[in-house]
């Protein structure tokens, strides 16, 4: 029996070396884009249109769309709100279409679109995501959004958590050092995750802008079974 591959790409800059058009690609940007996207669907958003540039987001705004947009953590002046999961309240997003542009996450989503299916992953939907991947029995590639093409810890830790769950199914295997390393990192951190996360660079960036109130929430596991999936130009739930 040929095992399905579980691979982890720790930076978008490395994606061309991992690209697999037959794989399910899971995009994760734990702090904060993927957590915000999952939260938006938990709170009833109809669809999210991820765009790579602020120019695209602004053009949608001029057409009357609600826009969430940030760069370096800060809300852009034309946007309705930014990138915190707490921005995506039921009162604000239920039944709506939202255009979304972020520093790292939305570009990673577009990059991943060459895969057979693109899913959005966060701790909030971790087990549901792992169960779906095991059910589908396809190769899986976890794409970490990172920070401006650089490695980051928080996304890699999540990749390890997801990979470990998927590999519990003996139809899957991995000889990918990105996978093995991310699992080792996750297991080193898991007993004191918040203590570990307090060291990461993004924690400092968020604290600098008084945006660190979401860090604990973004590491809560299994608050939902919803899995956002990319369908051409927009995200909806499976």
Predicted segments, located by residue:
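Long, charged alpha-helical interface segments
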Residues: 80-117, 131, 153-238
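Short, structured patches in soluble enzyme cores that scaffold and shape functional sites
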Residues: 102-103, 122, 144-146
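Residues that scaffold, gate, or flank divalent-cation-dependent active/transport sites
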Residues: 8-16, 33-45, 51, 55-98, ...
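Glycine-rich phosphate/diphosphate-binding loops that line cofactor/substrate pockets in enzymes
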Residues: 132-140
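Non-transmembrane, aqueous-exposed alpha-helical and coiled segments at domain scale
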Residues: 1-4, 8-21, 26-30
């Amino acid at each position: 029996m040929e095992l399905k591959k579980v691979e982890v790409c720790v930076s978008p800059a490395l994606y061309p070396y991992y690209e697999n058009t037959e794989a399910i690609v899971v995009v994760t940007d734990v702090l904060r884009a993927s957590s915000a996207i999952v939260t938006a669907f938990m709170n009833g958003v109809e669809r999210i249109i991820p765009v790579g540039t602020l120019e695209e987001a602004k053009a949608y705004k001029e057409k009357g769309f609600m826009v969430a947009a940030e760069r370096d953590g800060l809300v852009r002046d034309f946007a309705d709100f930014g990138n915190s999961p707490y921005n995506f309240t039921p009162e604000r997003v239920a039944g709506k279409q939202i255009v979304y542009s972020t520093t790292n996450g939305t570009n990673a989503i577009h990059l991943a679109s060459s895969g057979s299916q693109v899913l959005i992953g966060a701790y909030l939907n971790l087990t549901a995501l792992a169960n779906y991947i095991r059910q589908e029995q396809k190769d899986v590639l976890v794409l970490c959004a990172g920070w401006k093409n650089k490695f980051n810890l928080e996304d890699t830790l999540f990749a390890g958590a997801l990979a470990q769950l998927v590999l519990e199914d003996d139809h899957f295997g991995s000889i990918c050092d990105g996978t093995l390393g991310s699992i080792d990192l996750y297991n080193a951190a898991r007993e004191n995750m918040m203590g570990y996360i307090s060291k990461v660079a993004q924690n400092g960036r968020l604290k600098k802008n008084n945006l660190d109130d979401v860090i604990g929430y973004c590491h809560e596991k299994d608050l939902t079974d919803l899995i956002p999936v990319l369908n051409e130009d927009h995200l909806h739930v499976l």
